[in-house]
A protein has these predicted regions:
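Acidic (Asp/Glu-rich) sequence patches and key acidic residues
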Residues: 1-144
Length: 144
């Protein structure tokens, strides 16, 4: 079973370097492995947790699409219709991959004033709540 989290936003997706810096500013120890990559192509995005010899190689699946199409497909209500783009992050049972997905979603939401939608709970997550969940998943991933 896979899990998924979405960010609804307007404008262009932020550059990976800006996303990595935002994760750092939020206290999330993740980095996008290829700062020249983009979100437009989709697929697996390699990342690291930590740095140096103790860095953990990980990542998550990334898909970019239309906010309206995703909102309609999921039957979500209450999302501002001015938010035109959607980026989703998908992972399986690996907690560290889930932590990557949440770290990316928090950073992108912060950079774009976007809205984080968590599929399994069917609710909007605040930046603060998502950061807390990311820390919990990171700790669980290190024990996995």
């Amino acid at each position: 079973m896979s899990m998924e989290i979405h960010v609804f936003f307007s404008g262009l997706p932020p550059l990976p370097l800006a996303v990595t810096k935002a994760m750092e500013q939020l206290g999330l120890d993740f980095a996008i492995s290829d700062p020249d990559s983009g979100f437009e192509l989709g697929g697996f995005m390699p990342m690291t947790n930590g740095s140096g010899m103790g860095a953990i190689e990980t990542g998550t699946e990334v898909y970019l699409g239309s906010a309206k199409e995703m909102i309609d497909a999921l039957g979500i209500e209450g999302i501002d219709p001015k938010l035109e783009h959607e980026i989703s992050f998908r992972w399986g049972s690996d907690f560290m991959e889930g932590a990557c997905a949440i770290a990316l979603s928090v950073a992108i939401a912060k950079l774009t004033n976007g809205v984080i939608w968590e599929d399994s709970s069917g609710e909007v997550l605040s930046i603060e709540n998502a950061v807390e969940i990311c820390h919990e998943m990171t700790a669980a991933g290190k024990r996995q």
